[in-house]
A protein has these predicted regions:
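Short C-terminal domain-edge/linker segments immediately following a structured domain
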Residues: 25-35, 127-133, 166-167
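Conserved mixed alpha/beta catalytic, RNA-binding, or beta-rich assembly cores of soluble enzyme
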Residues: 58-165, 176
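Short, surface-exposed loop/turn segments at secondary-structure boundaries that line and modulate
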Residues: 1-19, 146-165, 171
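C-terminal alpha-helical interaction appendages
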Residues: 156-191
Length: 191
């Protein structure tokens, strides 16, 4: 099973006068999962209703290392160390590179999702439970400015900032440096 909650006044439509029910009460919907061909949920489906379902695409919503400085909340917040990123790219088969600031990294994870659109508009995705198997490798003498994700077909430079334009600009600069420094691109080709 997974569940989604709609928090009052949350997201871009939370203050909507057209849909006042989005700002009135906290509501929760529970979705059954159907196992896939392998007999497990990882390749199964999420049943929204009798007529609507979609593939389960599990990923880790919150993962990070202990921050380099004292922060208000490293689990719910975000920063160069990771945190509550809620990115579908934090999934099986992808390599996640994270800065390490302390001996032992003090890695943490949680907030497993069965699926999610492009963000958590309502404050939640399809929240679920599961088992996560990880392999860690320490890359010495490597300083990362932020979390990076290597997918089989793409590189993802992660950045969180407000306003959005600052995050996009900083992620672009980090991706440029990554392509130039690690992959030998010229700045023009990387851009």
């Amino acid at each position: 099973y997974s569940w989604v909650a709609v928090r009052p006044k949350r997201g871009p439509l939370g203050e909507s006068t057209r849909w006042p029910e989005l700002s009135s009460e906290y509501t929760t919907k529970i979705f059954p999962h159907t196992p896939g061909p392998s007999g497990i949920m990882q390749d199964g489906t999420l049943q929204f209703s009798d007529s609507i379902s979609w593939p389960i695409t599990p990923f880790i919503g919150t993962l990070g290392t202990a921050p380099d400085r004292e922060v208000r909340a490293s689990i719910d917040g975000q920063g160069a160390w990771g945190g509550n990123l809620d990115m579908r790219d934090a999934a099986a088969g992808n390599r996640i590179l994270m800065p390490v600031y302390h001996d032992g990294a003090l890695f943490y994870l949680g907030d497993l999702h069965a699926s999610q659109g492009d963000t958590e508009y309502t404050g939640t995705a399809a929240e679920t439970c599961g088992t996560v198997r990880l392999y860690f490798e320490l890359i010495k003498q490597k300083k990362l400015p932020f979390v990076r994700i290597e997918k089989p077909d793409a590189l993802v430079a992660v950045q969180t900032a407000r306003p959005l334009e600052v995050a996009v600009d900083t992620a672009t600069q980090h991706l440029m440096a990554w392509l130039v420094d690690d992959y030998g691109f010229t700045p023009t080709d990387a851009y």
